[in-house]
Amino acid sequence: MKRKWGLVRIGILSFWGALLLSIALAAPSQAHWADLAVANVEVGNTTTHITLTFPTGLVATADDNRNGTLSPAEVRAHQTELTTFLGDRIYLTDGNGDRGTLTVAPSDTTVLPPDQQVTAGTHSTLKLSYTWLKPVQGLTLHYDLFLPGVPTARCLTTINAPGQTQSVIFSPESKEADLMQNAPWYFAGGIPLAIAGCFVWGAMHAMSPGHGKTIVGAYLVGAHATPQHAVFLGLTTTITHTAGVFALGLGTLFFSQYVLPERLYPWLSFISGLIVVDIGLRQLISRLRQNRVAAKAARSHQHDDHSHTHEPSEHTRDVAHVHAQAAPHTHTHAEQTHNHHDHSHDRHNHSHEHPQLHTHDHGDGHVHSHALPGSDGAPVTWRSLLALGISGGMVPCPSALVMLLSAIALGRVGFGLLMVLVFSLGLAGTLTALGLMLVSARHLFERLPTNVRLARLVPAVSALVITLLGVGISTQAVMQIGLFKPFGTFG
Amino acid sequence: MESSHGVGQATLKRLRKVPLLVLSIAGLLLTIPIGLKVWTEFDRAKLAAPYRYEFERPSPGSVTQKLEQEIAFYQDRIRRDPDGGMNRALLAKVYIKMARATGETSWYLLGEQTAQESLVKLPFSNDGALMALARVATAKHDFQEAIRLSQKATPNEDTLAVQVTTNLAIGKVKDADQAADRLVAQNPDLAALTLQALVAVSQGQEQKALQAFQQGLAAEEPEETGSSVWARTVLGRLYFKRGQLEMAEKLYQEVLRVLPQYPPAVLNLAELEVRRGNYRAAETLYNKIFLTSQRSPTVYDHIVFRGMARVKELQGDPKSANEWRDRAEARLRLDLVAFGHRRELARLLLERGRPQDLTEALSLMEQEVKVRRDAETMDTLAWVLSRMGRWQEAQTAMQEALRWGIRDAALFQRAGTIAQTLGNTAQAETFFKAAQATDPTFDEQAQKALGLGVGLLGLN
């Protein structure tokens, strides 16, 4: 039971952590003192008492003298309607779903002299007692006493059960919680719901800004990627992200006396940005070269000892190219340029097809992939995909880190790790789906006439975008680190 | 077949490269924290030794966790002794500590409810409950009520501390001074000495203030994290007000090293960034406050809204600035009665600069000065009056603001402007010189950050 409670606590904490950290730019709450309520719950065997201080405006009709505070006389005079009103909004059910019988009484504090009632005039305090005929197990508290039209109204509640004290905040979004002896709070549905929630959260979180979506998008569109590449990229991001959260979480714990985790983020961003710049630059250089070559080849030129046919229209996966002679020539594969001077194509014409993915060995141990040579001759390489995936997942989401640290703080390391993994899978699901969509969409572009000059420029432009994004990420990180301050500052 | 063999070999080759990559990343992840540790220590070395927090800083969340443990402890004792009042008073005190640690207003309400229950159970000699109510009243800016409640309790360190704070707020600086001296005589701890320093600042006795801060920090104990961060925050703001931005920044950073989410330090750091013209950095800091305050409303929300409005305006986005001001205004209006935010609302209306708001701003300030007359409040009144062209009355208000000798460049600047308008050129010149002497870097950019910080010149 304790274990279950611990797991559920992690779920609750994670939920809050996620909420806190994932909506950085969300509109802040607008609740104010007059909307706030507080309650103290004393859990007993057959009777549970709630001392509730709430905005009197919620029961304005019972405030006969309109002084903003319910007096004992007013409570007695409106006993029935108060009981009905409050019983509909705040009730406790036992494990069988039976509601406790509610009685409402004025609080003892009304006997205090007015000068000791600081909130008099805005709030009233009542004692609510819920009674069952026999001892109960598995209590659930339902709280729905909020001012209408105030979505951010809150009720801070402390719950005291034997040997256990907890505080919880009810809100219009969180009106219900299970209260059990020795296992006070958990949301209905328990662990499976927590895991499912984590997956959905991760998936939704991936839609928020960041996570290298733009870079990945630019890469997949610019390069001739396949669905497998998109999946590989998604998986790499997941694995790196999960590993990053684990490493950072453990690092944070280990170095918590010395380093604030938030100071690590800019450094990781910086490294991530550098990787992206590297990828972008390599692609850019490679594609510019190929554009040049393609432009020449388009004229169907003839060299002294061998000819290449590089009609732009043949720059598809079905392209057949002819090596008429064994002269040294260059293949450029996006990330690396290698010379074929160490292996030969002995005076043979070979015409090979390039299905979606294949590698071939030239017999010298030099395996190279002709994964989808594109019209620009810049195929997607696994190395670049790996680097891109790592750069995308390298900076762990603070939300995931909070989730892990909350779990560790509660001693539920295993469950925390599982939740981080599920979160990352959700994240990867979205990223992969986006990647697949982009890859599918790219085929639409392929159907366009490829001899259009603009179409040849697309890969180079995408590489340039990647490079600029990388520069942007790195610069922002450097500024966050504080190594560089913008001009115009003083002090 | 040959093709699948090739694929297998290729995959193997790629996999061989993976450990190297993983090792490099792991190495980086380990090297960065160590590097940062060195960096942090190097950075901290620039902070004068007495201002450094030399104890082990609390692990993340441990401050509130400890308070939660205290709450559980007293709740358990209340269960064992349901008719007792003493444990409820102590519990109320912990709730108020929680309110101060988190800034969440709900804890004040819970503290009040519990203190009242305590007084029902123990109507006499219940100083703890009375002082808990006095603390709630202070938080709500009901200073007269706070003084009255504290006077009903037997004089002790708690009552003296409340008296220092409340007397400062209502402009009775001499009474605050006496209370602070008695407090320090009774228990010269960091909290008491910080209060004494604040009283000294309000009288322009900076050396005495610095001495009190240093003495307090020298007497610092590891168990008083709240006082440790508060003292450094207000000391940082004192340096900020003197134009020593580097020192202020170091102190705020030291606070955030101890308590990474401490709202006053985050807000003051944002104020500092606005003054430096680093609006993006300020915005990031305000967003950091939102991250931690989504759970429940806090007493700092309106400052954050105003700060965001200022930043947006300075970034050339008047539409967003207005939206943030609307939020701040809505919040301040709703809390006007409960938390006495009349002064803040008046300042917001003045910042908006709409002529039609001036009458309301004046009305608010006329109400406010009935209960609060610290330097900042009187300065705000002078601001309203001068905007309305009532320069003579503005001068009277400024004179009251400066009567205890407080040294603040912004106040001197306003006093100078008022004197100049009234034709007292020599006096105006004296004020402008005093402003420059107080803060040699006080310029147009510095004025853009006015009123965004927390602490030092009275409660926000």
Where are these regions (language model features)?
Chain B
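TPR-repeat structural position
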Residues: 67, 101, 108, 143, ...
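Structural motif corresponding to the intra-repeat A-B loop/turn of tetratricopeptide repeats
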Residues: 98, 102-105, 140, 170, ...
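Start-of-helix register in tetratricopeptide repeats
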Residues: 86, 93, 128, 158, ...
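Canonical tetratricopeptide repeat
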Residues: 90, 132, 162, 195, ...
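Residue-level recognition of tetratricopeptide repeat
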Residues: 93, 97-100, 135, 165, ...
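N-terminal leader/linker segments that initiate helical-solenoid repeat arrays
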Residues: 6, 13-128, 139-141, 148, ...
